[in-house]
């Protein structure tokens, strides 16, 4: 978990005699968060903040914990405190941008992602979260450019190609966007290659669901398959103007907050925009 590694790199701002206790609290909190022990991680993070209120690491850890607990407003405030303490802390902008997105605060999310890239320009080609934020901000041309750049990073990722299509279709129309669909290698996740064919005009929605049912996947694999199928069928139907079917699939995709990670949040944000 890259975000946890960031904590170790933030400069200390505590007296020497408190350093060992603080280091232990941060280590305990990171370990608990990795293990999914949210309450234990929250306790360690709160103690770290109390022990060293001018050290950004405690707030960063607590922001991660609150984000994991789906407390995006509180998480965003913690990352904001990190930025107040260290305006050059790029990863705090990245994390806060993600929390803003979950709250459907698209403009604020995009501003933070842009600030992150101002500080870390080398990350620009692979910043797919920014591309998605651009889509929801209505900046479709910029979004298409972001995902086009991502083609060099995600050569085997159907999602990058689909999001390029979704942005590009808003600019040049569906037919031309389909003709300009980014070429990819092989995305091994089921049913992503069928999803690719769907947006390429070579498959039907029922083909995507049929792919989900193939074989005898374990429960966790089946949940993943169903999630991606419902997410991209929802986005597909929305792109064709069928809001009813889009809602049906996006409701299924966003139903379980423990499935889909950030893309689950995308499903929920999109659904919130579709609802009257």
Question: What function would you assign to each model-found segment?
Answer:
Residues 33, 60, 67, 94, ...:
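Position-specific recognition of the canonical hydrophobic site in helix A of tetratricopeptide repeat
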Residues 51, 85, 119, 153-154, ...:
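Structural marker of alpha-solenoid helical repeat scaffolds
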């Amino acid at each position: 978990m890259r975000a946890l590694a960031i904590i170790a790199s933030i400069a200390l701002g505590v007296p020497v005699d408190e350093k060992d206790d603080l280091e232990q609290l941060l280590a305990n909190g990171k370990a608990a968060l990795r293990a999914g022990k949210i309450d234990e991680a929250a306790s360690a993070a709160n103690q770290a903040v109390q022990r060293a209120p001018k050290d950004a690491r405690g707030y960063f850890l607590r922001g991660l914990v609150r984000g994991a607990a789906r407390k995006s407003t509180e998480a965003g405030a913690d990352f904001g405190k990190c930025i107040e303490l260290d305006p050059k802390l790029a990863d705090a902008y990245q994390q806060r941008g993600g929390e803003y997105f979950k709250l459907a605060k698209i403009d604020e999310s995009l501003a933070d992602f842009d600030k992150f890239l101002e500080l870390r320009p080398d990350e620009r080609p692979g910043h797919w979260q920014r591309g998605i934020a651009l889509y929801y901000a209505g900046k479709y041309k910029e979004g298409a450019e972001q995902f086009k750049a991502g083609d060099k990073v995600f050569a085997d990722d159907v999602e990058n190609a689909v999001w390029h299509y979704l942005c590009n279709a808003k600019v040049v129309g569906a037919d031309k966007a389909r003709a300009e669909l980014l070429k990819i290698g092989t995305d091994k996740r089921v049913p992503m290659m069928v999803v690719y064919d769907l947006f390429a005009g070579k498959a039907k929605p029922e083909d995507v669901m049929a792919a989900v049912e193939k074989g005898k996947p374990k429960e966790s694999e089946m949940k993943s398959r169903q999630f991606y199928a419902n997410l991209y069928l929802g986005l597909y139907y929305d792109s064709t103007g069928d809001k009813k079917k889009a809602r049906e699939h996006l409701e299924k995709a966003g139903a379980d907050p423990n499935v889909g990670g950030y893309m689950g949040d995308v499903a929920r944000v999109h659904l919130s925009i579709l609802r009257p």
